[in-house]
């Protein structure tokens, strides 16, 4: 069986995702599509708008054959780690092709860039470190400048969010298993972070979340497939943003000592001291981020650091990667059965039977995620919710 892998968040699953999924199956001529998906918290350092189980239902209903969870210690990291660990899981599942959307849309350019960076890695990293010597320069800017220095601006614009993720997927494949084919499709209509919908049936997940958080499910439905609308209509919990977790984060910042926070993943350069001061002044999470924002620290980096503090994620090596199955179609079940003996990573379908150290961070993250009123039905869900299976 030929397998295509995709890296997703489905926050929530919308018409653009449906187009991407359909093209993945059509263009790669695969028998099975495997999605590695962020769980309770996503890459920009935010809570998912609805629980991972609801997003898994959306994915399966739309045609994904297997949904596996990207562990939170990787899912909430910067693009390099996010991509490396996503590819590690998909490679363990023996995918033939990685399919992704990008603003650039030319597969060969991603592969060319990745191969060149690997061949010139020492010089590339040195250029980044030199740029970071300027305390006003963010890591993202330093990385972009190093890339432009190596290639010029013609090959690939890595200031675009899908391009930079695609490049890191290509880089991870080049380092881990260059035999995995890389295929992209151009992103259509809506920009990744567009806050407003600007098309009849395609809108960014950002714009859709904004509508849902404002209570405009009917308007948001224009941009969702019927299968996602059905999941949302049956969902009885709240739509979530970091504002819901602000009291918990504020308590944590006020209660903890600076030395304690210094041991949290992503905390560096004394940023915890500024965060503790900002927490006392801010009245909301958006207010907190606005107070904290500088040229060196992007919103995404600040949110990721704040999230690590909320989750009490210690700056120690994360657990070994594992394959946590959230859901499968009948085809996905057949594929897993065929390959199970040849999969090098631990496979988790029943949490209570898994090695406790593997899932420690993810279980804590889900426990914190479900502290919000209205999510009582999902509390301890990692223990009593089996993989969702469809016929």
From Swiss-Prot:
Q: Which residues bind ATP?
A: 7-20, 101, 162, 187
- Reply yes or no: does the keyword Membrane apply: no
Under which main EC class is this enzyme filed? ligase
Enzyme Commission (EC) number: 6.3.4.-
Any one Gene Ontology cellular component term annotated for this protein:
cytoplasm
Query: A single GO BP annotation from the record?
Result: tRNA modification
- Task performed by this protein: Catalyzes the formation of N(4)-acetylcytidine (ac(4)C) at the wobble position of elongator tRNA(Met), using acetate and ATP as substrates. First activates an acetate ion to form acetyladenylate (Ac-AMP) and then transfers the acetyl group to tRNA to form ac(4)C34.
- Family as reported in the entry's similarity comment: Belongs to the TmcAL family.
Annotated protein name in UniProt: tRNA(Met) cytidine acetate ligase
What organism does the UniProt record list as the source?
Answer: Listeria innocua serovar 6a (strain ATCC BAA-680 / CLIP 11262)
Organism classification = Bacteria, Bacillati, Bacillota, Bacilli, Bacillales
């Amino acid at each position: 069986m030929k397998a295509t892998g995709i890296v997703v968040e489905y926050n929530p699953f919308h018409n653009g995702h449906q187009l991407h999924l359909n093209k993945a199956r059509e263009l790669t001529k695969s028998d099975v599509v495997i999605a590695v998906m962020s769980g309770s918290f996503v890459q920009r350092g935010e809570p998912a708008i609805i629980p991972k189980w609801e997003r898994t239902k959306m994915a399966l209903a739309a045609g994904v054959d297997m949904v596996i969870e990207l562990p939170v210690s990787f899912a909430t990291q910067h693009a390099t780690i996010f991509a490396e660990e996503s590819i590690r899981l998909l490679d363990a599942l023996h995918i033939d092709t990685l399919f992704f959307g990008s603003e650039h849309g030319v597969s060969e350019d991603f592969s060319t860039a990745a191969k060149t960076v690997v061949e010139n890695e020492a010089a590339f990293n040195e250029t980044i470190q030199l740029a970071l010597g300027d305390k006003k320069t963010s890591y993202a800017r330093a990385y972009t400048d190093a890339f432009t220095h190596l290639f010029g601006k013609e090959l690939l614009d890595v200031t675009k969010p899908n391009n930079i993720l695609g490049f890191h997927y290509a880089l991870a494949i080049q380092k881990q298993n260059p035999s995995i084919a890389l295929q992209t499709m151009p992103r259509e209509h809506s920009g990744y972070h567009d806050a407003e919908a600007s098309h009849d049936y395609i809108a960014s997940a950002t714009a859709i979340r904004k509508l849902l958080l404002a209570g405009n499910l009917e308007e948001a439905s224009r941009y969702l497939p019927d299968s996602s609308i059905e999941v949302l209509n049956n969902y009885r919990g709240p739509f979530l943003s970091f504002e819901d977790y602000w009291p918990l984060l504020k308590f944590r910042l006020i209660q903890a000592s600076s030395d304690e926070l210094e041991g949290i993943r992503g905390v560096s350069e004394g940023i915890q001291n500024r965060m503790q001061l900002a927490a006392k002044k801010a009245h909301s999470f958006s207010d907190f981020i606005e107070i904290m924002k500088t040229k060196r620290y992007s919103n995404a980096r600040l949110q990721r650091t704040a999230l690590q503090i909320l989750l009490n994620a210690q700056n120690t090596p994360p657990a070994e990667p594992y394959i946590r199955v959230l859901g499968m179609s009948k085809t996905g079940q057949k594929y897993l059965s065929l390959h199970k003996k040849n999969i090098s990573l631990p496979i988790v379908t029943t949490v209570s039977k898994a090695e406790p150290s593997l899932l420690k961070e993810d279980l804590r993250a889900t426990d914190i995620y479900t502290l919000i009123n209205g999510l009582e039905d999902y509390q301890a869900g990692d223990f009593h919710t089996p993989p969702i299976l469809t016929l």
